């Protein structure tokens, strides 16, 4: 990048200051006539003193050199530190990305494992279901075949004679049939095989029908009935008759037993499937019972569980049902389930139609209940929004209805799966905005996506981490340290609950919402009694604390060492003022001091925190929340003490101890945010304060809202109640005549909880490439990353005009860049110009146009961008993108554009408008330090004269009065700028003095320019624009030469060489004159005036026709030459690396071309030099290439051709030189013939001939050294 002027200028300023000091030291007061007669000792002293400045000069130079070295080292260290910080940031970002990727991979692997485990579990369940279905099918099929073939296989009469027919055993067996269980299958089967029950069939049938079976016992009962049916022919008809009578008797029951109905229906279906009843008898009985159940249950659907049980266990055989779960398992795992072959499809169809009708009525009931539930929820939300809470009856009614709806929904889903039907659509009712308050987006932690911190619970990410991310003590602390503690806490809590149940209802420590409401009502009714109760409560509280203190002191006598540890811990607790320290303290307490007495000590220490240390409350609350999973009694005891202290202050109703009250309320709020203090209790505390909204209660309510109001208002479960209380508070503020201080506090608390909605700005959508360009320029660009950004910018598709225009536009809009990074954009542009020349031109034009547009529009909303543009223009000069003429033209425009010469007000520059002064100071502060030598120094001196006149003209306007004086910050800004640029400048003290300086300056330059100042002095330039143009011509090509002669780098500006510094130092010493300082005016020399007069009185160019003809002819010749050269072919020169001198000497010192072996070797080979690099060192090796190779032959031919061309050019040059010498010799002879020849006194020394026309000397060119004779 181009070398900055900043380094050189600072060094030159120091040199100028040192030179001025040296001059001041060297100057001596002129010796008067009275002081001339002095002793010789004084004269010698003066000579010794004259040596002092030289020593001082050397010391100052050494100090200056040391300072420069220190500054250079300091800058290098800063650069290294910045690079290290950047590397650290990049490493941290890489680590974060790696951690995120690792977490994502772990989550993905965990998800895949869970999916695989779920799939494996599903497969196992499907296989188990498949196996059970086939086993059940085979068992039923075998049992059905046996029962259908029973008439042919029943035993004869002689078989029964061998069985036991005793009354005792048979009656005992019949009694056992009333309590059939699956566990008794074997014993009952064994007893049945040994008994003759021919005379007890009726009793057995009655016992079986009246038996209280479970669903798991139905298979055992069906097995026993099969045994009866296979042995006794009259068992099945008797059983069928009893079942019919049993069902007829059940129709008369008002409240049938659903469990018995479910098992009976399943029992009949099982008896029909296994063939005890015929299909006609059994199916008709099942259909009648099922139809009666469904018809009686079409509205209430209380017997839906009976239908579901029937479909689950017997639906496949009776109704031909295939559940959706079975279908999906068969399709997914390619399983074949047993077909329904027992009953024909024609007999199954009525059951299917009946069940589908029932499911239709069930879905209608579900939709109806769903609508009613939504209506109830909507009404409850409205009541909460209006009143803040629900009545107990309504809340209980809603919970019961919601439970019945959930049960109905689950039954509907089960029946839909069994019938392979789809569930109906149940649309969710979207809450209206009015139900949540105006424009409030309630924060729900379960929502996917990022946290919306602007509309969420917490103010920022740090607050969220502080209140939510707590350390898990159970992961660090051994479980044995708090396991017993948890057991004891559970026992204590159980004892406390039993004690509280026995206590009377007016217990003061009750914390339920109802008790708080009762206390609130009592507050409103009986004020005097409450004050007494509050006093008694305070006494009880202090007694309790004192008793605990005495008890602990007695315990401490036995364990003094632990007491010292606990005391040291409690003393250091107020020093835990950050998250790490308080977390460490929590872990320390849990590891080393976890006893019941120490926990009480900790609670008391937290409770009696000093009222001035409000900063400790969030950390103490975090300590309590961290300890809560391991020792919950700390949070419970502290909350109960704070609750009691709060009620004491509310009931006391005094106007003292406001700091203690605020401390208690703030502590409650902090514990609420950690969810240690319940939201209901916090809201009821706020309600108690609002009930008596006066004096200290106002401050306490506002403090509570400012601590946890946003948390309560943004939480879904407490939003409605909080909004009602906030509205109540605002209504009380309007109705009551409160002090202005209280009004401000109430409004601040309200708007902190519920800030007014802000309009969200719509972000403009841009193409990705434009977004990347803006990211590079506006985010990534910094002093350290300039080189990287330049590399990325060079990779852009610059051939695309749209991309180039957008980059130029982004650079012109410099106000989008951070103010401290504007110089980085100028640095970047200077490096980019080497590859894209037109970009720099367009950017400079755009910046100048924007500055001009700002002066024309002159609106305050553009002031910041105008400051940035002015700063950018100065930085462009620092990086040699513009010349000084552009800077001074802009500065003069600030003091002249739109300014009326007569001083009348202008709309472009109003009297009270001082922003142009700020723009001038901004440019001068940016690049004015480089105008310290040469013509640019004189230009700045001249401009400062006009600038002072502009400032004093602004000060003299009538707008500024004693009541409304001229802004003092503008004066300070001007003085700071001028002190930096011209420390010795003499400022004007009035408008007249500034005008007089301008007139003197204009008159002086008019005289120097040799112009007549009679008329022109009257019409002289008002603001020095013509003067600036003349000075630009006077500066000549020095600026452009300086601009074009230096290459640019990206990282740091180039360091100037020592020779340039010496030349600039000499120039500074020669031109170290200031037109505005008194010393410079006094030290003006006659030599400078004479030089100026020579410039003014020199030859002047007179335009004539011959000049125009000459210019036209020259242009024509140049054009023809260009056209001729464009048609020629361009010959590409071959690269020929020069051989080092020491190798040339070695080659020349080789063997001569004489005879012998050396001659043959040199004739057969040609020496070449091979260049190699090893590390940073170059190595040369001589190779003798044979002449037979193509490389040597081509090189030899090329050398011969060059030698011939060289000899031809030499001969041609010699001929020209000889011809010119002959012509000159003839002219000399003619001139000598006209005048006598001078005597040659030195014949032996022949002078070298110098050709008057500058002809070349061939001997010098070709180094022949010979003489022509």
From Swiss-Prot:
Using the UniProt annotation, give all residue ranges assigned to the region (Sufficient for interaction with UPF1 C-terminus): 1081-1269
Region Sufficient for interaction with UPF1, as annotated, extends over: 94-132
Specify where the region named Disordered lies, as residue ranges. Answer: 1-125, 143-162, 422-444, 487-518, 1017-1090, 1218-1269
UniProt cross-references to SMART domains, sorted A to Z: MIF4G (SM00543)
- Which segments carry the region annotation Sufficient for interaction with EIF4A1 and EIF1? 755-1269
Q: Which ranges carry the MIF4G domain?
A: 168-396, 571-755, 774-984
InterPro entries xrefs: ARM-type_fold (IPR016024), MIF4G-like_typ-3 (IPR003890), Nmd2/UPF2 (IPR039762), Upf2/Nmd2_C (IPR007193)
Query: GO molecular function terms here?
Result: RNA binding; telomeric DNA binding
Region (Necessary for interaction with UPF1), start-end ranges: 1102-1195
- Role this protein plays: Involved in nonsense-mediated decay (NMD) of mRNAs containing premature stop codons by associating with the nuclear exon junction complex (EJC). Recruited by UPF3B associated with the EJC core at the cytoplasmic side of the nuclear envelope and the subsequent formation of an UPF1-UPF2-UPF3 surveillance complex (including UPF1 bound to release factors at the stalled ribosome) is believed to activate NMD. In cooperation with UPF3B stimulates both ATPase and RNA helicase activities of UPF1. Binds spliced mRNA.
Which PANTHER family does the UniProt entry name for this protein? NONSENSE-MEDIATED MRNA DECAY PROTEIN 2 UP-FRAMESHIFT SUPPRESSOR 2, REGULATOR OF NONSENSE TRANSCRIPTS 2
Q: What is this protein called?
A: Regulator of nonsense transcripts 2
Source organism: Mus musculus
Give me the gene this protein comes from. Answer: Upf2
């Amino acid at each position: 990048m181009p070398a900055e002027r900043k380094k050189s200028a600072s060094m030159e300023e120091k040199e100028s200051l040192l030179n001025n000091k040296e001059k001041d030291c060297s100057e001596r007061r002129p010796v008067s006539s009275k002081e001339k007669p002095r002793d010789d000792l004084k004269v010698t002293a003066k000579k010794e003193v004259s040596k002092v400045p030289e020593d001082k000069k050397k010391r100052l130079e050494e100090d200056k050199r040391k300072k420069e070295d220190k500054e250079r080292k300091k800058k290098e260290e800063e650069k290294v530190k910045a690079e290290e910080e950047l590397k650290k940031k990049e490493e941290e970002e890489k680590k974060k990305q790696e951690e995120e990727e690792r977490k994502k991979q772990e989550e993905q692997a965990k998800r895949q494992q869970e999916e695989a485990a779920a799939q494996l579990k599903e497969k196992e369940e499907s296989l188990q279901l498949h196996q059970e279905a086939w086993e059940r099918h085979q068992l039923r099929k075998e049992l059905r075949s046996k029962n259908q073939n029973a008439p042919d296989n029943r035993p004869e009469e002689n078989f029964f004679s061998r069985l036991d027919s005793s009354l005792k055993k048979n009656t005992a067996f019949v009694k056992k049939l009333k309590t059939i269980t699956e566990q008794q299958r074997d014993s009952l089967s064994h007893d049945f095989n040994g008994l003759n029950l021919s005379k007890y069939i009726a009793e057995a049938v009655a016992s079986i029908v009246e038996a209280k079976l479970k669903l798991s016992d139905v298979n055992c009962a069906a097995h026993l009935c099969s045994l009866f049916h296979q042995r006794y022919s009259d068992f099945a008809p008797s059983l069928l008759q009893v079942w019919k009578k049993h069902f007829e008797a059940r129709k008369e029951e008002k409240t049938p037993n659903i469990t018995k109905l479910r098992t009976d229906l399943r029992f009949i279906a099982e008896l029909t499937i296994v063939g005890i009843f015929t299909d006609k008898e059994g199916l008709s009985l099942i259909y009648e019972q099922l139809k009666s159940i469904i018809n009686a249950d079409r509205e209430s659907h209380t017997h839906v569980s009976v239908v579901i049980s029937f479909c689950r266990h017997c639906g496949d055989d009776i109704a031909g049902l295939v559940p959706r779960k079975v279908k999906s398992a068969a399709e997914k795992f390619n399983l074949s389930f047993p077909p329904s072959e027992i009953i024909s499809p024609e007999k199954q169809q009525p059951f299917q139609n009946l069940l589908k009708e029932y499911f239709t009525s069930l879905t209608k009931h579900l939709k109806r209940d769903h609508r009613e539930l939504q209506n109830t929820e909507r009404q409850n939300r409205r009541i909460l929004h209006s009143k803040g809470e629900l009545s107990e009856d309504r809340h209980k009614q809603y919970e019961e209805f919601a439970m019945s709806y959930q049960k109905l929904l689950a039954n509907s889903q089960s029946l839909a799966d069994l019938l392979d039907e789809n569930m109906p659509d149940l649309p969710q009712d979207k809450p209206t905005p009015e139900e949540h308050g105006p424009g409030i987006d309630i924060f729900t932690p379960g929502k996917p996506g990022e946290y919306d911190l602007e509309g969420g619970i917490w103010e920022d990410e740090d607050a969220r981490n502080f209140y939510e991310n707590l350390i898990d003590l159970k992961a660090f602390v051994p479980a044995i340290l708090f396991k017993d503690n948890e057991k004891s806490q559970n026992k204590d809590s159980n004892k406390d609950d039993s004690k509280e149940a026995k206590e009377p209802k007016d217990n003061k420590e009750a914390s339920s919402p109802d008790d708080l409401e009762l206390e609130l009502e009592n507050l409103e009714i009986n004020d005097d009694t409450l004050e007494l109760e509050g006093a008694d409560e305070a006494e009880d509280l202090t007694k309790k604390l004192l008793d605990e203190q005495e008890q602990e002191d007695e315990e401490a006598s036995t364990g003094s060492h632990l007491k010292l540890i606990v005391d040291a811990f409690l003393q250091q607790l107020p020093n835990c003022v950050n998250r790490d320290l308080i977390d460490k303290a929590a872990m320390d307490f849990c590891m080393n001091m976890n006893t019941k007495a120490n926990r009480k000590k900790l609670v008391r220490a937290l409770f009696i925190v000093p009222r001035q240390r409000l900063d400790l409350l969030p950390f103490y609350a975090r300590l309590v929340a961290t300890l809560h999973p391991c020792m919950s009694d700390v949070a419970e005891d502290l909350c109960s003490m704070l609750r009691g202290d709060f009620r004491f202050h509310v009931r006391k109703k005094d106007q003292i101890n406001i700091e203690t009250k605020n401390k208690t309320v703030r502590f409650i709020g902090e514990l609420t945010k950690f969810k240690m203090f319940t939201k209901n209790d916090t809201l009821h505390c706020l309600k108690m304060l609002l009930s008596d909204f006066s004096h200290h209660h106002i401050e306490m309510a506002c403090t509570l809202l400012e601590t946890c109001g946003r948390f309560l208002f943004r939480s879904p479960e407490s939003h409605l109640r909080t909004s009602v209380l906030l509205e109540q508070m605002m209504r009380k503020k309007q109705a009551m005549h409160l002090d202005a201080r209280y009004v401000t506090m109430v409004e601040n608390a309200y708007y902190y909880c519920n800030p007014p909605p802000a309009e969200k700005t719509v972000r403009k959508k841009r193409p990705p490439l434009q977004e990347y360009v803006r990211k590079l320029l506006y985010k990534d660009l910094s002093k350290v990353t300039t080189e990287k950004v330049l590399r990325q910018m060079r990779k852009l598709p610059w051939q695309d005009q749209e991309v180039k225009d957008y980059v130029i536009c982004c650079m012109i809009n410099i106000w989008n860049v951070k103010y401290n990074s504007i110089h980085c954009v100028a640095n970047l542009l200077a490096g980019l110009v080497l590859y894209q020349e037109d970009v720099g031109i367009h950017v400079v034009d755009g910046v100048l146009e924007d500055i001009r547009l700002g002066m024309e529009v002159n609106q305050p909303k553009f002031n910041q961008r105008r400051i940035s543009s002015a700063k950018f223009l100065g930085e462009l000069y620092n990086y040699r993108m513009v010349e000084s003429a552009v800077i001074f033209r802009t500065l003069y425009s600030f003091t002249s554009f739109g300014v009326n010469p007569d001083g009348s007000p202008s709309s472009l520059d109003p009297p009270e408008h001082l922003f142009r002064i700020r723009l001038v100071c901004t440019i001068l502060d940016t690049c004015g330090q480089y105008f310290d030598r040469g013509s640019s120094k004189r230009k700045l001196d001249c401009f400062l004269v006009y600038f002072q006149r502009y400032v004093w003209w602004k000060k003299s306007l009538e707008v500024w009065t004693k009541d409304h004086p001229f802004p003092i910050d503008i004066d300070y800004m001007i003085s700071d700028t001028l002190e930096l640029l011209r420390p010795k400048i003499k400022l004007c003290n009035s408008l007249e003095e500034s005008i007089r300086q301008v007139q003197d300056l204009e008159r002086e330059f008019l005289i120097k320019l040799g112009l007549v100042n009679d008329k022109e002095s009257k019409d002289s330039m008002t603001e020095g624009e013509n003067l600036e143009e003349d000075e630009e011509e006077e500066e000549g090509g020095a600026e452009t030469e300086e601009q074009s002669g230096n290459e640019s780098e990206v990282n740091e500006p180039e360091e100037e060489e020592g020779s340039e510094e010496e030349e600039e130092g000499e120039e500074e010493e020669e031109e170290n004159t200031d037109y505005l300082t008194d010393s410079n005016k006094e030290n003006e020399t006659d030599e400078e005036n004479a030089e100026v007069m020579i410039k003014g009185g020199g030859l002047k160019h007179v335009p004539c026709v011959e000049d125009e003809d000459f210019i036209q002819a020259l242009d024509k010749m140049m054009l023809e030459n260009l056209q001729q050269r464009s048609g020629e072919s361009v010959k590409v020169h071959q690269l020929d690396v020069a051989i080092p001198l020491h190798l040339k000497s070695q080659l020349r010192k080789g063997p001569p071309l004489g005879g012998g072996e050396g001659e043959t070797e040199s004739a057969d080979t040609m020496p070449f030099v091979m260049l190699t690099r090893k590390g940073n060192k170059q190595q040369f090796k001589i190779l003798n290439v044979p002449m037979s190779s193509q490389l040597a032959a081509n090189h030899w031919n090329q050398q011969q051709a060059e030698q011939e061309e060289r000899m031809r050019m030499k001969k041609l040059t010699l001929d020209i030189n000889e011809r010119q010498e002959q012509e000159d010799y003839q002219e000399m002879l003619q001139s000598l013939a006209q005048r006598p020849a001078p005597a040659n006194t030195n014949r032996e020394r022949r002078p070298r001939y110098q050709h008057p026309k500058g002809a070349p000397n061939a001997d010098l060119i070709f180094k022949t050294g010979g003489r022509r004779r």
